[in-house]
């Protein structure tokens, strides 16, 4: 499966989806499956609107993460419209006790970047003084990670 998502910084941190499933709470970058006929960037824009309620400009690829049978492509994005937290994709109405668990858009503050999944991206951003500058640097040479 191929997925596309975004790294989106704001005044309060990085945009994430808080997932609560099977009693666990975790934070993932916005994104989802690439639909037939979509480019990776188109899928990243669509998923960002569905999950966050924001229209974004894609600045370029910053990371590719291989996880199990999935390749996840992440793009640096900039919000250009919409209202954060108004995403209306089908998953956004999923209750905590459902098989899929719940989804909620929020800004993860910098001191919590280490909790972010994919873990290689979260760990890298947590370890540097200027995460946004580091991610911008990845535009020149997107990182590749295998997450276990």
Residue ranges of model-derived segments:
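Short, well-ordered beta-strand micro-motif
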Residues: 8, 76-78, 106-109
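Hydrophobic pocket-lining residues within nucleotide cofactor-binding pockets
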Residues: 34, 79, 110-113
């Amino acid at each position: 499966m191929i997925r596309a998502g975004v790294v989106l910084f704001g005044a309060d941190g990085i945009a994430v989806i808080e997932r609560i499933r099977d009693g666990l709470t975790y934070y993932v970058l916005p994104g989802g499956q690439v639909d037939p006929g979509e480019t990776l960037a188109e899928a990243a824009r669509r998923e960002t609107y569905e999950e966050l309620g924001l229209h974004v400009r894609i600045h370029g690829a910053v990371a590719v993460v291989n996880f199990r049978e999935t390749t996840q492509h992440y793009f640096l994005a900039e919000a250009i419209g919409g209202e954060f937290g108004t995403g209306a994709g089908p998953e956004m109405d999923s209750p905590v006790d459902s098989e899929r668990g719940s989804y909620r858009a929020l800004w993860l503050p910098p001191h919590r970047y280490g909790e972010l999944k994919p873990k290689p991206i979260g760990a890298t951003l947590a370890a540097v003084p200027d995460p946004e500058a580091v991610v911008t640097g990845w535009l020149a040479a997107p990182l590749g990670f295998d997450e276990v």
